[in-house]
């Protein structure tokens, strides 16, 4: 898979002056004696992250579900427990709608009673299975949703059958969800202890929903393996993941930019952007440091944010993911009855015009708007490319956080709202 990185800014950047720091942090990421080794399972790829026996078991389970006309899987999880899988599905399949294909629905990622009610109403006419994903089982959003939905499934088909359609992805060492799964004889998939939620899509956390949707997981793994090898050097000039990390750091530290906007030109990348926001937001946003991760979809958001980006305050830079080959394309035909200027575009395709919009917008924002732009060009939106891109960003994120001087693998600030909510509810977490 080809990934190109191009910087579009008048700012002069000195990368080589940071090579010694990069070497130090590269060793910290890759050394088996690293002080962070208990959080680096995602980087020990595929040896730690991939369990071939578990994937084979998942394949058999999915095949059995499909043979029994169970064509809807409800994935219950929040944060890294669902964002990676949702990002992968949309990235690889597009947004549909799809007919006569397995459907994956995501719940447990909010406390909206309306959303939960409406999706349960939809499920009343469906044969569905449940995959609840939580390392501990004590996170309130998925815990509540699982309790309600599992009882709903029992009411629909009975407890005995409901147990055969409920799958638990959790820690195999301890936790409330593990105890529930064991006491109710539910199928268990492992959440690997050394892989944090936001780094977990390339593991059992992401694979079961993807297999259910008939995604080629082997190609995702292959793309990630290739990226892991490609970005295994500490050389800034040869490692684009580290070059991206250093670009971000310099924008923040040397030029006082406070926000990075990840921009895509395809709506099916909305949830990839959301996954990226969690990855960098939770990894870097601590000790009063870090770039604020924002996102936009162009050309849609040019009609809402375009004015601000062009002429507003200059406290942000843009990283653009551009996909060279679209999934599908449509030609524009001339309509004689339409005496409009659009007729002059007949003979072109929609993707050609989207590409020209990308070129024009990048030029306008970088040259006239004085916003630094970093362009990541990827070949396509295949499973292999998805795996590659995930590994690219995960490696870049770890390096970026180390450059910033923060721990990439904890998220202590998240506990504050959880603790206050528990107090409000009189709930012992």
Curated annotation (Swiss-Prot):
One family name in Pfam for this protein: PGI
GO cellular component, one term: cytosol
GO biological-process terms attached to the record: gluconeogenesis; glucose 6-phosphate metabolic process; glycolytic process
PROSITE patterns for this protein: P_GLUCOSE_ISOMERASE_1, P_GLUCOSE_ISOMERASE_2, P_GLUCOSE_ISOMERASE_3
GO molecular function: carbohydrate derivative binding; glucose-6-phosphate isomerase activity; monosaccharide binding
Record has Cytoplasm as a keyword: yes
Pathway: Carbohydrate biosynthesis; gluconeogenesis; Carbohydrate degradation; glycolysis; D-glyceraldehyde 3-phosphate and glycerone phosphate from D-glucose: step 2/4
Reactions catalysed, as given in the entry: alpha-D-glucose 6-phosphate = beta-D-fructose 6-phosphate
Gene3D superfamilies: Glucose-6-phosphate isomerase like protein, domain 1
Location of the protein in the cell: Cytoplasm
Entries under NCBIfam families matching the protein: PRK14097.1
Biological function: Catalyzes the reversible isomerization of glucose-6-phosphate to fructose-6-phosphate.
Protein name (record): Glucose-6-phosphate isomerase
The organism of origin for this protein: Mesomycoplasma hyopneumoniae (strain J / ATCC 25934 / NCTC 10110)
Gene designation per UniProt: pgi
């Amino acid at each position: 898979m080809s990934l190109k990185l191009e910087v579009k800014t008048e700012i002069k950047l000195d990368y080589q002056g940071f090579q010694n720091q990069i070497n130090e942090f590269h060793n910290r990421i890759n050394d088996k004696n690293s002080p962070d080794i208990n959080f680096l399972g995602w980087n020990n790829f595929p040896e730690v992250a991939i369990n071939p026996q578990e994937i084979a078991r998942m394949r058999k389970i999915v095949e059995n579900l499909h043979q029994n006309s169970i064509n809807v899987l409800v994935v219950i999880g929040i944060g890294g427990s669902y964002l990676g899988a949702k990002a992968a599905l949309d990235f690889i399949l597009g947004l549909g709608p799809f007919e006569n294909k397995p459907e994956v629905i995501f719940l447990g990622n909010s406390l909206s009673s309306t959303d939960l009610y409406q999706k349960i109403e939809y499920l009343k006419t469906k044969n569905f299975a449940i995959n609840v994903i939580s390392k501990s089982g004590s996170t309130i959003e998925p815990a509540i949703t699982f309790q309600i939905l599992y009882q709903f499934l029992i009411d629909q088909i009975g407890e005995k059958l409901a147990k055969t359609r409920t799958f638990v992805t959790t820690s195999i060492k301890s936790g409330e969800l593990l105890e529930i799964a064991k006491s109710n004889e539910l199928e268990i998939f492992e959440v690997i202890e050394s892989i944090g939620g936001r780094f977990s899509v390339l593991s059992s956390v992401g694979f079961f929903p993807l297999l259910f949707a008939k995604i080629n997981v082997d190609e995702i793994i292959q793309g990630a393996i290739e990226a892991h090898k490609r970005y295994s050097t500490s050389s800034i000039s040869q490692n684009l993941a580290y070059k991206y990390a250093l670009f971000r750091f310099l924008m923040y530290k040397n030029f006082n930019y406070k926000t990075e906007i990840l921009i895509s030109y395809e709506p099916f990348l909305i949830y990839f952007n959301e996954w990226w926001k969690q990855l960098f937001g939770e990894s870097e946003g601590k000790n009063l440091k870090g770039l604020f991760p924002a996102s936009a979809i162009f050309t849609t958001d040019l009609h809402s944010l375009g004015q601000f980006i062009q002429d507003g305050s200059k406290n942000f830079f843009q990283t653009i993911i551009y996909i060279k080959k679209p999934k599908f394309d449509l030609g524009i035909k001339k309509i004689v009855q339409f005496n409009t200027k659009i007729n002059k575009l007949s003979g072109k395709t929609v993707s050609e015009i989207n590409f020209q919009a990308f070129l024009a917008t990048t030029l306008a924002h970088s040259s006239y708007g004085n916003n630094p732009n970093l362009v990541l060009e990827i070949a396509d939106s295949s499973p292999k490319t998805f795996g590659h891109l995930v590994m690219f960003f995960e490696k870049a994120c770890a390096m970026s956080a180390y450059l910033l001087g923060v721990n990439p693998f904890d998220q202590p600030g998240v506990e504050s709202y959880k603790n206050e909510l528990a107090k409000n509810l009189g709930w012992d977490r």
